[in-house]
């Protein structure tokens, strides 16, 4: 088998690209695409009256059922469908409609943004806040425009299906932890048995093994890889551990043996199929550091060519097979495949080491000639790129700190505004109480004013009636006066003609009548002034009444409430009266029952006494009846009669020859 040496100096390097502009344009285009898709789906929802975003979890469910049927069999797929259907039914029955639609839509859009390569950052969080705000403020209250009965099962599936997948994920996580624990226990047992086997060897071989181990550790400078490397699933690395690979490995040699294990735990992106034992300690140290820095920048063609060369010659290029954790990209969180490779054991490592050390020194020289110029060419670029990465990390850290400070300032401002709103709420409550008190006082004043208005209207009517009556009397008085004057003139003329003596009396009478007329005119003027004043008061009261129409509405509402309360009080009093009557009737019935029971007991006692007396009478009475010989006037009495019943003890004479009952 021919050996091929990779000419590292002739490898094609990729063109340099400005990563800052590329990242900005790529991220903005990605989030603009998200916004456009979201807007189009909302528009389709509004136009067609159906929520199309609910179909995406249904499509994911169909894919997962197909994958489970293809890889895990029919039984598991049927079980998965039954569990998902049960979860959907529970969500459909027990979650209210509005909360169900809100949770389903929010989960769909949040999960859609989560499926990006960016992870959790400020744009994704802002998109999440936008989606949640739109769902809560607009679509949460507006369910009339959609077919609720058609969309509700899909909404229940959007909640039930993630719950089922979360349950399966939790189960797999628990089983993974249990498997790791079992592996650790088995590893401890294997180490214990290995120590027993080493102790069982002769002491000379034990000393030789110890010396070999010390020489290997001193020559390598880097500790050997643990045989218990964690097997990584899904072929990816978590997003929060992509940047923690370069710095711990650069400082690899400065730390002790205990810290080396912690640094290896952070290097989670190493593929298990490519872990091999190094050929030489110096060559391994140089090429490990070089390839760790350069593998971050190599494109896919370079990686493919180096992997083909590594497969053909595993000894010369064993140290080039380390892959950087930052170069591995996680495909999607839904991937179910695993990259579980075989890790070589300690015996295979020793065999490879012996094979590689047995080669001629010319191979080492060739390898140094092929790789050292490449190291000298690539180290400055790697350092520059590392410095750029460090600057980017510092800038990101500073930006995150600024965002954190802004969020804290927003939280403090929101808390202060909340306190101000609470104080304003207290003031508004106090103002509301004051306004209620003023309204109550205004209602009371309005009642008083209405009472005064009614009294004044009554007085006005009385004054108008008195005025009309006085005017009638005045007209009658004028007519009578005219008639009297006419009659007086006639009488004067007649008297003057007949007698000249009556003129003085008539003149006195005329004077008196004129004085009375003047008095009546004065009284009329006074009454007219009073009537004018009353009319002015009535006008003022009418204006006041027109201004208080709003208070009349309040009074009507208050009167209606008072009528209701009066009706309720009347009904309550009627119910209490009925209850009292029922209780009194119940007491009377109980008393009558007790009296009847007492009478029944008395009758029972009387019956018992009568039975005793009957028994005594029947015991003493002869077999034949006798007539009353001594008293012929008395009628024949029967053998037994109720008239002979006595409450006192029996007064019979036992010495009598013939028994005769005594009549009382």
UniProtKB/Swiss-Prot annotation:
This is Macoilin. Plays a role in the regulation of neuronal activity. Keywords: Endoplasmic reticulum, Glycoprotein, Membrane, Nucleus, Phosphoprotein, Transmembrane, Transmembrane helix. It is found in: Rough endoplasmic reticulum membrane; Nucleus membrane. It is a multi-pass membrane protein. Residues 320-348 have a biased composition (Polar residues). It comes from Macaca mulatta (Rhesus macaque). Residues 253-274, 320-375, 630-664 are annotated as: Disordered. The keyword Lipid metabolism does not apply. The chain crosses the membrane at residues 28-48, 75-95, 120-140, 154-174. The modification Phosphoserine is found at residues 305, 332, 631, 634. GO terms for cellular component: nuclear membrane; rough endoplasmic reticulum membrane. InterPro entries: Macoilin. One of its GO terms (biological process) is neuronal signal transduction. Glycans are attached at residues 324, 340, 452, 655. Residues 253-265 have a biased composition (Basic and acidic residues). Belongs to the macoilin family.
């Amino acid at each position: 088998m021919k050996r091929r040496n990779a000419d590292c100096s002739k490898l094609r390097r990729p063109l340099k690209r400005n990563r800052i502009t590329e990242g900005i344009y790529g991220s903005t285009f990605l989030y603009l695409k998200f916004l456009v898709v979201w807007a189009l789906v909302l528009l389709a929802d509004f136009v067609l009256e159906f929520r199309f975003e609910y179909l995406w979890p249904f499509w994911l469910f169909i894919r997962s059922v197909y994958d489970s049927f293809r890889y895990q069999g029919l039984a598991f797929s049927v079980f998965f469908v039954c569990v998902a259907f049960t979860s959907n039914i529970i969500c459909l029955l027990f979650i209210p409609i509005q909360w169900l639609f809100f949770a389903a839509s929010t989960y769909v859009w949040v999960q859609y943004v989560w499926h990006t390569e960016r992870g959790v950052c400020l744009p994704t969080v802002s998109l999440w806040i936008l989606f949640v705000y739109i769902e809560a403020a607009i679509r949460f209250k507006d369910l009339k425009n959609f077919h609720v009965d058609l969309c509700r099962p899909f909404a229940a599936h959007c909640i039930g299906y993630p719950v089922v997948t979360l349950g399966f994920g939790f189960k797999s996580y628990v089983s993974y932890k249990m498997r790791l624990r079992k592996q650790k226990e088995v590893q401890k047992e294997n180490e214990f048995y290995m120590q027993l086997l080493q102790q069982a060897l002769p002491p000379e071989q034990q000393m030789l093994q110890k010396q070999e181990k010390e020489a290997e550790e001193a020559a390598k400078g880097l500790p050997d890889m643990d045989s218990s490397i964690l097997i990584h699933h899904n072929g990816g690395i978590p997003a929060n551990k992509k940047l923690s690979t370069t710095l711990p490995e650069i400082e690899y040699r400065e730390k002790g043996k205990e810290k080396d294990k912690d640094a290896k735990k952070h290097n989670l992106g190493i593929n298990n199929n490519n872990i091999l034992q190094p050929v030489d300690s110096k060559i391994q140290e140089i090429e490990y550091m070089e390839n760790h820095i350069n593998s971050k920048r190599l494109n896919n063609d370079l990686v493919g060519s180096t992997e083909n060369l590594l497969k053909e010659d595993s000894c010369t290029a064993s140290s080039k097979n380390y892959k950087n954790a930052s170069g591995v990209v996680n495909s999607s969180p839904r991937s179910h495949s695993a990259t579980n490779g075989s890790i070589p054991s300690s015996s295979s490592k020793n065999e490879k080491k012996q094979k590689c050390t047995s080669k001629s020194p010319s191979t080492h020289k060739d390898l140094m000639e092929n790789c050292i110029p490449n190291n000298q060419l690539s180290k400055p670029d790697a350092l520059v790129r590392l410095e750029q990465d460090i600057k980017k990390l510092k800038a990101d850290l500073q930006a995150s700190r600024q965002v954190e400070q802004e969020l804290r300032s927003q939280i403090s401002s929101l808390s202060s505004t909340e306190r101000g709103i609470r104080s304003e709420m207290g003031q508004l409550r106090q103002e509301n109480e004051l306004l209620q008190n003023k309204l109550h006082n205004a209602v009371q004043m309005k009642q008083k004013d209405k009472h005064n208005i009614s009294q004044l209207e009554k007085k006005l009517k009385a004054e108008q009636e008195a005025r009309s009556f006085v005017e009638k009397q005045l007209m009658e008085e004028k007519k009578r006066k005219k008639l009297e004057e006419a009659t007086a003139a006639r009488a004067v003329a007649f008297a003057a003609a007949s007698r000249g003596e009556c003129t003085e009396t008539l003149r006195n009478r005329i004077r008196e009548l004129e004085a009375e007329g003047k008095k009546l005119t004065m009284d009329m003027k006074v009454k007219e002034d009073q009537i004018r004043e009353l009319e002015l008061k009535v006008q003022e009261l009418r204006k006041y009444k027109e201004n208080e129409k709003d208070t009349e509405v309040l009074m009507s509402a208050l009167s209606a409430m008072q009528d209701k309360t009066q009706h309720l009080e009347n009904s309550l009093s009627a119910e209490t009266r009925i209850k009292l009557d029922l209780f009194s009737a119940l007491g009377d019935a109980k008393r009558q029952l007790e009296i009847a029971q007492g009478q029944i007991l008395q009758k029972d006692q009387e019956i018992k006494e009568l039975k005793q007396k009957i028994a005594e009478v029947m015991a003493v009475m002869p077999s034949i009846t006798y007539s009353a010989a001594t008293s012929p006037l008395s009628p024949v009495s029967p053998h037994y009669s109720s008239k002979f019943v006595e409450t006192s003890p029996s007064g019979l004479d036992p010495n009598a020859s013939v028994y005769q009952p005594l009549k009382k």
